[in-house]
Structure formats: C-alpha cells, structure tokens
C-alpha cells in the first residue's frame, strides 16, 4: 500500500471519510478491502460504523501507521482502575475522554473492522469502569436492566455468598 494513496470510506450514515491507506495495517478488514479493490477511486463502504466512530478509529490507525510505533501491551486482568499505570500517554489521552457510549460504539467498530489492538484498548477502558463496582452500580453505569424479577432477587438475597 502506497503511503500517498487516499481512500474514501463511506460510513453507515452515508458520510465520506478520507484516509491514507497506509493507515490500514492494523485492520484486517480494511487491508482486505484495499486488496480486493485496489483502485484508489473506489469508495469503500463501512456499513456498520458511523462517521463519528469511523473518525475515532482513523485517529487511532493514523497514530499507529508507522511500523516503529506499536500499541503497548495491556495486562490482563487490569491491576486496578487507574489506566494511567498501564497505558502510554497517547493511548490514555485518546481513550479516557470518551463517554461510555462512545466506547461501546468504538469497540463495536473496532471489532467490525478487525482491529484487535483497539478492541483491547477499549476493553481495558470499559473494564476500568467496572472494577470495584457493585452489580447495581455497574448496571446503572452501563444501562443494563436485570432479567430477574423482584421475587427472584429477594430469594437470591436470602443466600449470600459470604
């Protein structure tokens, strides 16, 4: 892939985002699309990713397009909720300002485009949000409703695990 070749990606909301195809090395899907459609004027549809999310993904890919710059390994499990301890400065400044909904959209987009390093980064951010949370706090934070009835929850509470 030639560094000077610009590609037009069409987001799921019909917006065009231009990017150099030299940025695609971390994405198996984008690399395959360029190989399948080598003509630079060919618009590449990205059906499951909105423009806003696609721009965030491209920012990540542009940062890591240089072979000398590699994403830092993130320990699993996280040692604690402070991402500053496990991320380099760029990744920290990239991921921490995002809302939880933006993170969910980003992890879905990164998964769709097969960018495992970005999936790992966003997963670490989401995991850091859940560390030390009680179940109800995590449900509230992520908008998850319980599938248990009140009666089932009351029955469950009769038998604590402690």
Feature annotation, model-predicted:
Residues 1-2, 139:
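Short leucine-rich amphipathic alpha-helices used at interfaces
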Residues 2-116:
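Canonical BTB/POZ domain core
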Residues 7-10, 95-103, 107, 116-162:
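Alpha-helical protein-protein interaction/assembly modules
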């Amino acid at each position: 892939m030639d560094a000077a070749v610009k590609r037009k990606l069409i987001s799921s909301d019909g917006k065009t985002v231009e990017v150099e195809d030299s940025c695609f090395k971390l994405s198996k899907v984008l690399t395959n699309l360029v190989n399948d459609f080598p003509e630079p004027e060919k618009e590449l549809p990205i059906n499951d990713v909105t423009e806003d999310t696609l721009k965030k993904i491209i920012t990540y890919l542009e940062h890591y397009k240089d072979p000398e710059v590699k994403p830092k390994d993130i320990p699993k499990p996280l040692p604690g909720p402070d991402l500053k301890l496990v991320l380099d400065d760029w990744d920290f400044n990239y991921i921490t300002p995002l809302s939880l909904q933006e993170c969910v959209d980003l992890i879905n987009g990164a998964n769709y485009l097969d960018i495992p390093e970005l999936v790992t980064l966003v997963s670490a951010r989401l995991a850091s949000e859940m560390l030390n949370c009680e179940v109800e706090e995590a449900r509230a934070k992520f908008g998850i409703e319980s599938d248990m009835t009140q009666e089932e929850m009351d029955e469950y509470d009769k038998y604590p695990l402690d």
